[in-house]
Amino acid sequence: MAYQIEYAYTCHIGKIRNNNEDNFWCCGDSLETQNQGMSHIRSGYMKQSEYPLLAVFDGMGGESCGEMAAFLAAEACGEHFKTAKDGIRNDPEEFLNEICESMNQAICDYGRTN
């Protein structure tokens, strides 16, 4: 049985910080490194056959460069998804392991050089 996913997302800076330290990846959309969140809610639909991947990178603040960690995770998530999308269909668990390793590597590489 095929199904359709309806999704909606937004990102808000909150009341404490001067910059938003959260990010996401949704159907190719994410925020820039330095951002103030979003001013509105975005929404859409996708078919099951599109093998969707939606990700939230929350709670990466509190340390220096939390916004960079969230951005790098979103960027690596999107890059891996675009190059290895068929992995979701073939072996979802392995795909998630690989994408987590890719995101972690991007953040660790940044930490070593900055």
Where are these regions (language model features)?
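PP2C/PPM-type serine/threonine phosphatase catalytic domain
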Residues: M1-N114
